[in-house]
Regions:
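Proline-centered helix-kink/hinge sites
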Residues: 85-86, 119, 166, 286, ...
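Short aromatic/basic micro-patch
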Residues: 84, 121, 273-276
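Core alpha/beta nucleotide-donor-binding catalytic domains of modification enzymes
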Residues: 2-118, 128-132, 137-140
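Short, small-residue-rich loop/turn micro-motifs
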Residues: 15, 85-89, 191, 250, ...
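C-terminal target-recognition/interaction regions appended to catalytic cores
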Residues: 212-350
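Class I S-adenosyl-L-methionine
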Residues: 70-80, 88-245
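A generic secondary-structure signal for well-formed alpha-helical elements
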Residues: 26, 85, 131-134, 146, ...
């Protein structure tokens, strides 16, 4: 960790998608997302397997604990908080959407750490459904509680596909800037129009074609086709466009589920699910990021993660709050992976 780096605490860190995007210094689809001046000094998550993956990939280990029981007085002082508070009760996939569910109140742990640590900036992520709950009253209530801790708060629906992620994933991003910081925040502008979206074929592993474990048996296909009462909508994928949103349920995917599947042979009705590595690429994880767990755990962690590439742009967009000025437009600061260049000094103080 550099002496003058900006210190970050990550709540609900999961396997580390947000953290990787915040730090930067990774490659994805022939592009290098340059190291940003952030360092994670504290990370916590309740999921033991997610923490196992996190600690396999990051220098600073995450703590496996219930964030509700963490004494924030005892963690390091930080410049920024990041956290994708659990969102099952807010998800459009969840038919219950019970706002009295305890999981719907975990954002209050963000409020609690803001009250104690007073960071200059915080970034939160949640599902699109949060905007729709009680006709927008829930997101406004959450924003008001953040504002009451002394922050100027903005939220916006961000489409990951517009930032080079090969997936039509939409997430609510909430950004707070402490009121005494002289910085007017703006969300990053979309970089790609629809005709330039990254297609799914760029992340599909041809080697998986020979691995039978990812294919649905013909018996399973016939059974799912005959279960008319359970049929929802088969989301087979067009390889020439971005993937539909992947979820944490990919290990249980069927041709009738809401998770995308690949139709390998239309004539023979041969289907397969994504491999964990393909799912990770769809989320914009670099191949260097490893998942040292079984497939079901990997699918869950990947589906719950924040796309690192999307988070890189969000993290870059708040640097002005810390006195940094970009040398040029952010999109010009991404170096082609194989181009031999010296390390870019992306941000200057002053």
């Amino acid at each position: 960790m550099k002496e003058n780096s900006l210190k970050v605490a990550s709540l609900f860190c999961g396997c580390g998608g947000s953290d990787l995007g915040t730090i930067g210094g990774f490659s994805f689809l022939e592009k290098d997302y340059t190291r940003l001046p952030f360092d994670i000094v504290y990370a916590v998550d309740f999921d033991t397997k997610a923490v196992e993956t996190y600690n396999h990939n990051f220098e600073h280990p995450a703590v496996c604990a219930d964030v509700c029981n963490v004494d924030f007085e005892k963690i390091p002082d930080v410049d920024m908080i990041i956290g994708g508070f659990p969102c099952q009760s807010f998800s459009t996939v969840n038919p219950t959407k019970d706002t009295n569910d305890d999981r719907a109140h975990l954002y209050k742990q963000i409020v609690r750490i803001l009250h104690i640590k007073k960071p200059k900036v915080f970034i939160c992520e949640n599902v699109k459904g949060l905007l729709q709950l009680q006709y927008g009253a829930i997101i406004k209530r959450i924003a008001k509680e953040f504002e009451d801790e002394g922050y100027s708060v903005q939220f916006q629906l961000i489409k990951a596909v517009e930032f080079g992620v090969p997936q039509k994933r939409e997430r609510v991003i909430i950004v707070g800037i402490r009121n005494d910081i002289n910085f007017s925040y703006n969300f990053p502008s979309p970089l790609l129009k629809e005709s330039d979206y990254v297609p799914l074929r760029k992340v599909i592993d041809k080697l998986a074609l020979d691995n039978p474990k990812y294919y649905f048996s013909q018996k399973a296909v016939e059974g799912m086709k005959n279960a008319k009462n359970n049929m929802k909508r088969g989301l087979w994928q067009d390889l020439n466009g971005p993937s539909l949103t992947i979820t944490s349920h990919l290990a249980k995917t069927s041709i009738n589920s809401r998770d995308p599947v690949l139709l390998v042979d239309p004539d023979k009705e041969i289907y397969r699910r994504f491999t964990p590595r393909e799912a990770a690429r769809i989320q914009s994880f670099p191949d260097s990021f490893e998942f040292p767990v079984s497939d079901p755990y990997a699918y869950r962690q990947i589906g719950n993660a924040v796309p690192p590439v999307m988070m890189w742009y969000i993290a870059s967009s708040v640097l002005g709050a810390f006195g940094y000025k970009p040398n040029t437009e952010v999109e010009h600061l991404i170096a082609p992976k194989h181009k031999q260049t010296k390390q870019l000094e992306l941000w200057n103080m002053g």
